[in-house]
Swiss-Prot record:
Receptor for gonadotropin releasing hormone II (GnRH II). This receptor mediates its action by association with G proteins that activate a phosphatidylinositol-calcium second messenger system. This is Gonadotropin-releasing hormone II receptor. Residues 61-76, 137-160, 225-278, 324-380 are cytoplasmic. Phosphorylated on the C-terminal cytoplasmic tail. Residues 1-40, 97-114, 179-204, 298-303 are extracellular. Glycans are attached at residue 101. It comes from Callithrix jacchus. GO terms for molecular function: G protein-coupled receptor activity; peptide binding; protein-hormone receptor activity.
Amino acid sequence: MSAVNGTPWGSSAREEVWAGSGVEVEGSELPTFSTAAKVRVGVTIVLFVSSAGGNLAVLWSVTRPQPSQLRPSPVRRLFAHLAAADLLVTFVVMPLDATWNITVQWLAGDIACRTLMFLKLMAMYAAAFLPVVIGLDRQAAVLNPLGSRSGVRKLLGAAWGLSFLLALPQLFLFHTVHRAGPVPFTQCATKGSFKARWQETTYNLFTFCCLFLLPLTAMAICYSRIVLGVSSPRTRKGSHAPAGEFALRRSFDNRPRVRLRALRLALLVLLTFILCWTPYYLLGLWYWFSPSMLSEVPPSLSHILFLFGLLNAPLDPLLYGAFTLGCRRGHQELSMDSSREEGSRRMFQQDIQALRQTEVQKTVTSRKAGETKDIPITSI
């Protein structure tokens, strides 16, 4: 994450540059607060302000009391959790990254080193797992609209629980490492936690799979199933459904445009996740398998790619804001359509009632005429 911290979870080949042993330690070049790092800090501050404001606004919008006539949407609950994860990234990862680049070395002590590395990875796990939950929810909403939605809470709990458990190793791997001379220097690193190089590489690959590869695969499967399900002939033909099921399905799908917006929103969340983090993780893989490339790749490239990854946190509330505005317009159109349908229904009922009254009057008149003809004529 910083000049000495090249991956999102902190373990990097860069640590070996200054935290080695013997002659490497004495002759290594210590990191400095370079011009590229200064630009990175400035951009991080801008991202922090925009992400904090946007995600706090999303939380306020989702948690405020809603009109009684509107049923709470599952999408709102899901984006409340996504906003919470983005806020965790905002208030842990961004300030930590900016401060660490300014101080260059670690000045907060061993306990803060372990705790902040744990919180940082937990925040990034949550921000990666919650879009998967959104994809699973959209898959259930599209492919099985009549099914129960109670499983969403379990999925949300599993996402947060896994984020906590998978980040726990950070508490034991990271610690402060001190360098006595020629210039005293302290850093938060994994130096000495791995007995062999392959162990560190295995841990990095495992974290990479859990942070990026597995969530990306799960989301790709979800949206592929949605596309296949929507395009299948069975889904398009509604005439084969029983009458009762068709009526119930209409009651669930009375807002198709809102459902379509929710699906588009989930797809945009997936696309932003891919676009923001793919370049940085690919660079991390390059570092792990070819540490010599550290001297060939300019540090500014690592700065740019990580800032591009942090852009994901302020983008999510913008997507939700666009979705909310679209839903409000949809609700207005829906209310207008409902009022028109209600007026048409009342006019139809009035016409039916008038026709019935006319038929009744005709029947009464014809009966009276028949009774008059049946009266016998007597002579006086």
